[in-house]
Structure formats: structure tokens, C-alpha cells
Swiss-Prot record:
It comes from Aromatoleum aromaticum (strain DSM 19018 / LMG 30748 / EbN1). Homotetramer, a dimer of dimers. One homotetramer interacts with 1 SecA dimer. It comes from the Bacteria. The gene is secB. Keywords: Chaperone, Cytoplasm, Protein transport, Translocation, Transport. This is Protein-export protein SecB.
Length: 159
């Protein structure tokens, strides 16, 4: 293979994985530990990407897990921002966003899930094990919502 052909090959590598931010709140402790009601668990996910250098991107998956009892009493609130630095080169421009919003979160999610479960357990609660997430379907749904919003605003979607 020539040098030019090697240089044009797609590159995807993990440079670093790390916890960017971790917070845990138990605002109603210690009384909340005496409550025997079953709480409602709510999980929210958010993915953000930024260009760090040429062909190097930071992708951050933020997982927020809240647990509430009736009457809107918070049991706990955990937020983990699991980040990674990825080298992504020679990927077609149209595919770059999908790689960062599907491929990278798939790599980050198991680490975020472990951090969430560990924080909740260390706070004195039963662990919450997050179910696997289909980031591809989330990305496609987001793209459809953006296209619908653009159509309502009278704009043409960018392809």
C-alpha cells in the first residue's frame, strides 16, 4: 500500500476515557432511608462532541439518574459525565456526526453505567443497573425531530 493510500484510510481510535464530572445528591437524608415506598427512577442521556485538535474529538456522554417518591420527594440524584478523547480521521464529513453520536457513546456507556451504579451503592441505596441503550435509534429519532422542526419552520433539511 502506498503512503497516500495509507494516509487516506479511515482512523478511529480511543486516546483516553475519563470521568469528566460526577455528582451525587441525597437531599432528604437521613429520613429518606426510613421510607419504604418504591421510588420512580428517571434516566436522561445527553451526548456532546467538540473538536479538540485536527482529527481529535472529545465526546461526553452525560447520564442523569433521579429517584423520586410520591409528593415529588427526591431520594437521590446522580449525574455522570463520562468523556473520551477519540482520534477520528478520514471519515466522510456526512458520517462524522454519526460516528461521534453513535459509536463513541456506545464505548462510553458501560463506563458511565458503572459509575452511576457505584455512586448509588456508595450512597447507601440498592444499585440501579441501567439497561443497554440503542444510540443508533436515539440518533435517528433526533435527526427526524430536527428535520420535522426544520420543515415546520419552512427550512430545508441539510443532507
Amino acid at each position: 500500500m502506498t503512503e497516500n493510500a495509507q494516509a487516506a484510510q479511515p482512523v478511529f481510535s480511543i486516546e483516553k476515557l475519563y470521568v469528566k464530572d460526577l455528582s451525587l445528591e441525597v437531599p432528604n437524608a437521613p429520613k429518606i432511608f426510613l421510607d419504604r415506598e418504591n421510588p420512580q427512577i428517571n434516566v436522561q442521556l445527553r451526548t456532546e462532541a467538540s473538536n479538540v485538535d485536527e482529527g481529535v474529538f472529545e465526546v461526553t456522554l452525560t447520564v442523569t439518574v433521579s429517584s423520586k417518591l410520591p409528593e415529588d420527594r427526591t431520594v437521590f440524584l446522580v449525574e455522570v459525565a463520562q468523556a473520551g478523547i477519540f482520534q477520528i480521521r478520514n471519515i466522510p464529513e456526512g458520517d462524522l456526526e454519526a460516528v461521534m453520536m453513535i459509536g463513541c457513546p456506545n464505548i462510553l456507556f458501560p463506563y458511565a453505567r458503572e459509575s452511576v451504579s457505584d455512586a448509588i451503592t456508595r450512597a447507601g441505596f440498592q444499585p440501579v443497573v441501567l439497561a443497554p441503550v440503542n444510540f443508533e435509534s436515539l440518533y435517528q429519532a433526533q435527526q427526524q425531530q430536527q428535520a420535522a422542526a426544520a420543515a415546520q419552520a419552512g427550512e430545508l433539511p441539510i443532507q
